[in-house]
């Protein structure tokens, strides 16, 4: 479920006074911290996943990991399949916000700012409102920020980080 060892799971239960849900959340956060540390490591192996839906929609997704051992692992291939299904269903335009061209981000920020000012919102709150509008806009269009199709309570990025925690390798 979390990919942590029995000792770590037991420690999490002790730390949360036996509350299973809190222990599970603590282990997930610990796994995401480990995943972020692994983010620095180079991913040289991986697979290209594909999905075709009714001969109308086709998706090719490249997902990389550090070793060919993990690339052949069933959990990794399941992760790749899930990402393919998500891309087919959600049609993201970018992988992450960092991939959006600066000109497009600036143009959207200006458009949203003009809209907020035209609506008569207070100037001191305008920047905060625009920031929220940009975040929502990109959450709909950037793969890693989209709600994961199989579990809308988490983003695709969180799903991938769970995979990193379980597999013990960086995934990009």
Protein language model regions, located:
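N-terminal assembly/interaction segments in proteins that build large macromolecular machines
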Residues: 1-172
